[in-house]
Amino acid sequence: MTKKLMVGKVAVGGGAPVSIQSMCNTKTDDVAATVAQIHALEDAGCEIIRVAVPDEDAAKAVDKIKEQIAIPLIADIHFNYKLALMCAERGIDALRINPGNIGGEEKVKAVADICRQKNIPIRIGVNGGSLEKELRAKYGGVTAEALVESAMGHVRLLNRFDFDDICISV
């Protein structure tokens, strides 16, 4: 059995029904376009929505978007842990990160700390593009085993920082 997490008001894992999730393909800082797309996806049955947060403008749009939508919002963070911190301060419902590409352990700890304080779950997303070079070499490329080992290493890192509201996406 998996652990039940709350992404906003939607239960994920732990025997909860499978939730329908999608991701916007708009520029997140184009609030009007992003909100319009979220409303269309919600009308089609989407229960949780994810947006890319590649820069500060996108992070600053999070609270404006949340004011206008009814479903939980996940911020997809790459490379800059400060964007995760900004989104957490702006009321994001969950974060999607790859701890291996947002900086060193102190940066991961900062994200884990704010997420623990604000009850924000973290989705660990691992894919072939983010797979560590050492694991590619160990397994001879991108393999299921390499992806699982990477994800579990990230889980252990977050656990070291007393964080366990984790969803894994491989």
Regions found by a protein language model. Give the residues of each.
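Alpha/beta enzyme core
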Residues: T2-V51, D55-A75, F79-V170
